[in-house]
Every structure is written in C-alpha cells, then in structure tokens.
C-alpha cells in the first residue's frame, strides 16, 4: 500500500462521516481495505493482502475485519443507505432498481441508485439459500420497505421511481409501493392473467396490431386472487443477443408504452452496477462460505464503488473543458472504439493518477441523470 498521504486522509474523512459509530481501528481497517480494493481491483483476500508490506499480518487483519461480529452486516448496509441519502441531489427524479444476485447457495438482494447508465448499491442483504426457502418474497419486501421508505422520506414521493424485474412482480410489493405513493414500472411474466374490459386474459395471448412494437393495454386488474388496478403495456425489445423479445410492463401511473419502456430501460443499469462490483472491483473473486463475512466484504466493495462514483461525479461530470480533457486522457490509452462507463473511466484514471483521491468529499452531490461526454 502507498504511505499515508492526503488521499488517505480524504478517504479516512469519508469513512468517518459514513461510519461515525465504528471504533477507530475498525474504520482504519475499512479505509485500508477499501483503498486496496480500488487499487488492486480484486475481492480475493490473498491478493488484497499482497498490497500491504506484511502479507501475513494483512491477511489476518482482513480476516478479523470480515469475521468481526461487532460489525453487523445490517449496520453496514444502513450506513451505506444513510450515506447515499446525504449525497442525493436536491432536484430531479431519484430512481431505485431492485435485483437479486446469486453465487452458488449465497443470495444477495440489492437496492441500487441509478446514476446515468450505471447504478450504485445503497442497501443490501445477504442470505443462504436454505434461509430463503419459502420466505424469499417476504424477506425481499422487508428489505425494500426499509430502503424505499427512507429514500422517499428524504426526497418526497413525487421524485421517487422504482423498477424491478419479473422476480419482484408480487401483489404485496405492488400494494406497498402504491400505498407509499411512489411510481413504479415492473416487468411481469407473460403467463400473468389480467382483466381487461371485464375479460380475463393471459398476457402472452395478446398480439400487436400490424407491425407495431408498442401496445398500451390500458388499466386492468392484475392478479385474479388479489386484484390490483395497474396500467399494463407490451413492447418488443431486443435482448443482448439481438433476438426479439417482449416486455410486459405494469405500472401504477398512466404511462404510455414508450414512457414505460424508457423508464424500465434504466433498470439494466442495476445489473451493470453489479457487474462493476463483480469485475471492476473484483467481488466475483470472493470465495467465502460464511454468509456474514461475504456480506461484510460486499459492504467494502459497495463503499469502494460509491467512492469511485463520487470522484467521477466531481471530476468527469463537471461538463466543462477540463472534464472533457481529463476523459480524453483515459480514452487516448484505448485502441479502436470503446464504451466507457462512469466506473471504468474513473478506475482507469485512478490507476494513472492515484492522487485524484484528493478530490473526495463525503458531501458530494451525485448527478443522477448525467453521463459521460462523448470524446474522440
């Protein structure tokens, strides 16, 4: 690791502001390993330890941190949520995306904040598959209720937006979000039965008129067992392999098909954000059987990710000539066409100039609707 410098002090201030309740040695360990994750881009404990002078001592220190029972995973998740609330902008929509990520028998439920075409995990829970058996929807609703309620209390219901995939299409979630007054667009399964104009029909039996790609179905009653009045649309979309598929989207607002697709199309940023955590920050390389230790390591990765996005917000999204010049320095080192995300660009830049961490501050307001400028 690099010696103590102003960049370390900035990160230390950020961790202190985020975890004021943690002991000093806990905050120092979190700071050191968050910085190691950013430097080494790995979640492998051995590789992280190699970045320190004494590898054996660093390995033991990381193990103590990840197995420290006083650092409860739920407290770390709460700290991540509170830090995100501090960094939310004062204006504009605040979009939340829900997603599960699975590694063997370990399941991670993540509530992410959409930032441009990417997302930052702001709240999470990790579970063993055996614990989730028969309780998955109930546990998910409890986590979502806590995260979404706190965000809406901060920004107001009019600014909130929630998107989720088919696994979250549940009457209990629809009821909660509608009762909270927050707008949502959730993809539902094609086998779902919906009552339109008094006639119950399964969505996959409906057809598009002519060669159109959008069809608003209007307001219908979702789920015959516990009817929910929702606006439903269907749209043709290509998947990652270029094959045509159909999105059946349910919303509690009278969105047109185009509006519903545009809103839901931001949700893949959540998947992209998880890929950033897994590959750019190396969480995919983590190998831990104990679910609480795995959750604590994800907390370190989530902190590292929000640090990177905060720096990118201050340095790359400023919208001036200097920001474009700095971004061009990253692009100039790549061959041919390349698509840079906010995270990959900032990570590449930090590798070139580690002292950029001097610009970190715990109160940086995230620019949720901004994306990288196009440079050549």
Which role does the model predict for each range below?
Residues 59-123, 128:
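Active-site-proximal, Lys/Arg-enriched surface segment
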Residues 1-42, 76-78, 92, 105, ...:
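Single, function-defining residue in the core of a domain
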């Amino acid at each position: 690791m690099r010696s103590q410098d102003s960049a370390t002090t900035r990160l230390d201030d950020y961790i202190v502001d985020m975890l004021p309740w943690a002991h000093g040695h806990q905050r120092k360990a979190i700071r050191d390993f968050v910085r190691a994750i950013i430097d080494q881009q790995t979640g492998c404990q051995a590789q992280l330890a190699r970045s320190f002078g004494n590898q054996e001592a660093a390995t033991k220190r990381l193990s103590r941190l990840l197995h420290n029972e006083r650092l409860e995973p739920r407290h770390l998740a709460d700290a991540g949520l509170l830090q995100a609330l501090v960094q939310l902008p004062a204006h504009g929509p605040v979009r939340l995306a829900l997603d599960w990520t699975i590694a063997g028998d370990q399941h991670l439920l993540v509530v992410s904040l959409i930032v441009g075409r990417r997302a930052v995990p702001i709240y999470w829970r990790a579970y063993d598959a055996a614990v989730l058996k028969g309780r998955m929807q109930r546990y998910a609703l409890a986590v979502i209720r806590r995260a979404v309620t706190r965000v809406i209390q901060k920004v107001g219901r009019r600014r909130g937006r929630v998107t989720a995939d088919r696994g979250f299409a549940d009457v209990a979630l629809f009821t909660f979000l509608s009762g909270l007054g927050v707008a949502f667009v959730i993809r539902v399964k094609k086998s779902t039965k919906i009552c339109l104009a008094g006639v119950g029909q399964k969505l996959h039996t409906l057809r598009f008129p002519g060669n159109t790609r959008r069809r608003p179905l209007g307001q219908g009653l979702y789920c015959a067992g516990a009817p929910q009045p929702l606006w439903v649309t269907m749209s043709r979309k290509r998947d990652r392999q270029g094959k045509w598929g159909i999105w059946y989207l349910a919303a509690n607002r009278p969105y047109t098909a185009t509006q519903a697709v545009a809103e839901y199309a931001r949700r893949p940023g959540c998947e992209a954000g998880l890929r950033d955590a897994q590959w750019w920050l190396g969480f995919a390389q983590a190998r831990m059987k104990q679910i609480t230790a795995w959750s604590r390591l994800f907390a370190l990765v989530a902190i590292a990710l929000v640090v990177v996005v905060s720096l990118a917000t201050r340095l790359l999204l400023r919208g001036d000539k200097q920001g474009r010049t700095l971004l061009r320095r990253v692009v100039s080192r790549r061959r041919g066409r390349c698509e840079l995300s906010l995270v990959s660009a900032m990570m590449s830049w930090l590798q070139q100039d580690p002292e950029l961490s001097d610009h970190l501050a715990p109160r940086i307001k995230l620019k949720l609707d901004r994306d990288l400028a196009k440079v050549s």
